[in-house]
Amino acid sequence: MTPFEFRQAVRHRDFRGPTAGHCGDYAQANLAILPAAHAHDFLRFCHANPKPCPLLGVGEPGDFRVPVLGRDIDIRTDVPAYNVYRDGELSERVESIETLWQDDFVVFAIGCSFSFEHMLAKEGIGLRHVEEGRNVPMYRTTIANRRAGVFGGELVVSMRPLRGADAIRAVQITSRFPGVHGAPVHIGDPAELGIADLARPEFGDAVTIRAGELPVYWACGVTPQTALMAAKLPLAIAHAPGHMLMTDITNASLAIF
């Protein structure tokens, strides 16, 4: 299935699940959608926090197409699920934002680690959440983001359990793709990130960690949602964690070496 066909399936509500493992050669995007009055500060926030917030594209005010991301994209309908934030609180999860769209909304598309998972799989590195049919586990750390205007919050990380040799190889592979979070930010003890219990992720689903495996953590594109919470905007929208926008951008084009 091509990214265009995948987006059409989402648009017509034929697909509603997590997007990990789909259209493996193409980049997936996290989304943050907010009023234009706050767009400059959010852009500064992304530039100040490039590890969790690598930008793939930014729309014009009121533009729900964002053509730099792909053909015939409609941001309002082409994501399997959206989180709606009101005054910094998660208000609802919806399957379309057509009725919520505002003429001053600006779309920020942020790189996603699902994009490099295909590269890991091709090298024989197993992905537990894919094997178990679950959403990747994501954790809110105690590491503060660099602030920009009203945007702050804490770093969110995704976690994949790997054997030592696979963890080393994963560092080598993902370092080539800073546009989709790059190399891990931590390997090992979750307490060093302020994570109390790996069995209780704030976002996504817990996965099995087997004997001899290390938890490997990547900066995560759910991080902007902690910034939206901290900003307490009257209305802001993001993708539901694990439910991404499929783009026409090839993963190969994002490699820096």
UniProtKB/Swiss-Prot annotation:
Record-given protein name: Putative hydro-lyase Bphy_2364
NCBIfam families, sorted: PRK05463.1
Taxonomic lineage: Bacteria, Pseudomonadati, Pseudomonadota, Betaproteobacteria, Burkholderiales
GO molecular function per UniProt: lyase activity
Alphabetic keyword roster: Lyase
Entry-linked InterPro entries: D-Glu_cyclase (IPR009906), Putative_hydro-lyase (IPR038021), UPF0317 (IPR016938)
Class of this enzyme: lyase
Enzyme Commission numbers on file: 4.2.1.-
Organism per entry: Paraburkholderia phymatum (strain DSM 17167 / CIP 108236 / LMG 21445 / STM815) (Burkholderia phymatum)
Homology family: Belongs to the D-glutamate cyclase family.
